[in-house]
């Protein structure tokens, strides 16, 4: 697991005869928009052991420094996740097909969503306790029901992606919210701090 970007390079080179990578540069900037790899075996994050790859999103060129061109397009952004998981057994004793949750989480990074969990595990890497671990796909929600039932995007995730424009509440009143997965509606309440506000949604 020490060179996951090389795995992506090798996989893409093996697939190059069957895939025209030039079709996957939607904005025509000379860079393949994204590659997603499902790798065989287990995920280190799901109990697979330290020799397994930890599912992640990264970059072949701007991250790992490999200058690889396929069909005239540079290979860069990628994400990956595992075929199997040890979470389902409960005690890590057996392998099962991995749920879709971690795929949804890692693929959402390629849309531009950040992690919402404490990424350095020392309460300084972006901890966001207000999101409720299980309700945010980019926090720990990808592990709901062992990864088989990830949550819908929440209000902040939808706002970042441009899928939701929260309505600002500026006066007292009675307000109604439908479940966010039905119409993407959320409310916003500003605070005295310029860069801080609350988002209200119905899950």
Say what each PLM segment does.
Residues 34-36, 40-203:
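Extracellular hydrolytic enzyme modules, especially secreted metalloproteases
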């Amino acid at each position: 697991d020490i060179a996951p970007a090389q795995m992506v390079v090798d996989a893409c080179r093996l697939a190059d005869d069957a895939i025209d990578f030039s079709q996957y540069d939607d904005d025509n900037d000379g860079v393949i928009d994204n590659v997603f790899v499902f790798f065989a075996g287990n995920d280190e994050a799901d109990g697979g052991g330290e020799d397994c790859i930890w599912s992640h999103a990264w970059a072949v060129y701007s991250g790992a420094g490999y200058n690889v061109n396929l069909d005239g397009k540079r290979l860069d952004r990628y994400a990956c996740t595992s075929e199997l998981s040890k979470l389902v057994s409960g005690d890590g004793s057996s392998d099962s097909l991995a749920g879709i949750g971690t795929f949804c989480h890692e693929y959402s990074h390629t849309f531009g969503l950040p992690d919402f969990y404490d990424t350095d595990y020392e309460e300084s890497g972006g901890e966001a306790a207000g999101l409720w671990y299980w309700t945010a796909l980019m926090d720990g929600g990808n592990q709901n029901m062992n990864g088989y039932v990830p949550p819908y995007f929440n209000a902040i995730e939808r706002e970042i992606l441009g899928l939701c424009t929260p309505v600002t509440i500026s006066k007292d009143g009675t307000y109604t919210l439908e479940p966010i997965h039905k119409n993407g509606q959320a409310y916003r309440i500003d605070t005295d701090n310029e860069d801080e506000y609350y988002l209200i949604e119905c899950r």
